[in-house]
Each structure stands twice: as structure tokens, then as C-alpha cells.
Amino acid sequence: AMRAHAKSMVFPIGQPNDAFAQYFIGHSYLFPVSTSQVGVFNVTFEPGCRNNWHIHKATKGGGQILIGVAGRGWYQEEGKPAVEILPGTVIHIPANVKHWHGAAADSWFAHLAFEITGEKTSNEWLEPVTDEEYDKLK
């Protein structure tokens, strides 16, 4: 399944995302598309994989842009319904907004993640998305 997913992708899957594994349920993979000017990473999630709730903090600017590139996934801001991400879907995540993103339960998923430059930027990793919350998504 991973090999079939890799063939459908424009960007490499990359390496296991071990540095951030503690903030994910399931396995994810990371490929740095660009690290100059703006950080751009291809993040691949196995089916059911999602990251914890988190916040991209900044006093000015900051945040993140996600662009779906393969498979099917989800993005959710706290207090709002989840949004389906398909190839070509663009998600603008403002700084200081609690959210999570990851694969659908039945699909491999990949998105490009663009780190938006800002002042005093940092990431705050929070609690996992519960199975109860996640299992409601279809």
C-alpha cells in the first residue's frame, strides 16, 4: 500500500518522522522539499495517522499553509468541523490557532507544509486527537 501511494506522489515520501513521532498517532514520513527562504516539507501519513492538537505561535506573521498532494486527509481547528483535504486543497492556518491534521482512516495521505515566517515563532504541541473525535470523521 505504501509503495502504491509513493507511485501516486509528486514528491518523495522521505524518512520516518522520528523527531516528531511523540506528537503523532501512527507513522508519518518527512521529506524537506526546500529549507531556504521558506521551509517546505512533504509530510506523508499512513492511514489513520494524525498529529496531536498543536499551535503555531507567533507575535507577528507565522502560521502554516498546507496543500494536499496525494490521498485523503483531514484538517480541524478547535471548535470547528473537520475539513477534508484532497490533492489540490489549500488550508491556511493562522498563527495562534489550535488545530490538527492527518490521514483519513482508509487512506494514505500527503501534504506540503509551508512554514510562514514571523516573529517569535514556536510550536506548542498539545494533547492527542482522541479515537472518539477521530472516529466520527468519514
How should each PLM-predicted stretch be described?
Residues S36-V38, E46-R50, R72, E119-K120:
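Short, charged/polar surface micro-motifs in flexible loops or helix N-caps
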Residues M2-F41, N52, S122-K138:
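A short, N-terminal "cap"/entry segment at the start of jelly-roll beta-barrel domains
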Residues T44-E46, K57-Y75, F114-I116:
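Short, conserved beta-strand element in jelly-roll/cupin
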Residues G79-N96:
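Short acidic-glycine-tyrosine-enriched beta hairpin
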Residues D106-W125:
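A short hydrophobic beta-strand segment most commonly corresponding to one strand
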Residues W53-H54, Y75-Q76, I93, K98-A104:
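Short beta-strand His + acidic residue motifs that chelate non-heme Fe in jelly-roll/DSBH
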